[in-house]
A protein has these predicted regions:
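Alpha-helical oligomerization segments
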Residues: 103-155
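Extended amphipathic alpha-helical regions
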Residues: 78, 82, 86, 100-105, ...
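Extended, low-hydrophobicity segments enriched in charged/polar residues
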Residues: 1-96
Length: 155
């Protein structure tokens, strides 16, 4: 419950309006992506599954990983419900959600990534917004992140 509360507080502090959800799934032989897409779009009330963008990434061993990325426009979806499920992903939830969902705000130029109950990453273009988030939410940072964030805020 603490992880969810922290995720929501940071989510709302980062931006008041998210206009896209980017959903990314790794292609694997034993993975039924169509089932995940159906579940994701129906459970979280996305009307239509967009065409995927295929992304190839070479891992540290030289293997090529192929991801399918889907950009869902946000209309009236309950994004807090989606956040709750991401936080629960590793604890009896839908494990395909772990590390696979990004929330995008074009208004605030924010990328918000709650990867699971372990934490949140927020990419911010605006230095003032980064400072505001750091100042208002520094008590939510984990100790091991504090030194790096202080360095980034100082510039």
């Amino acid at each position: 419950e603490r992880a969810y509360a922290r995720a929501v507080e940071l989510f709302e502090q980062a931006s008041s309006e998210y206009d896209y959800v980017l959903f990314s799934l790794l292609r694997q032989e034993d993975r039924d992506i169509d089932t995940y897409l159906w579940h994701f779009s129906s459970k979280f009330n996305f009307d239509k599954v967009p065409e995927p963008e295929l992304i190839e990434v070479e891992d540290g061993t030289g293997d090529v990983l192929v991801f399918e990325r889907y950009l869902f426009p946000v209309t009236d979806q309950d994004l807090n419900a989606l956040l709750r499920e991401i936080v629960k992903a590793d604890h009896g939830g839908f494990n395909y959600l772990s590390s696979s969902v990004l929330f995008l705000s074009s208004q605030d130029n924010i990328i918000y990534h709650c990867y699971d109950d372990r934490g949140v990453d927020i990419a911010v273009l605006d230095d003032d917004k980064r400072l505001e988030l750091f100042t208002d939410c520094h008590d939510l940072l984990f100790d091991y992140d504090m030194e790096e964030m202080e360095r980034r805020v100082r510039g």
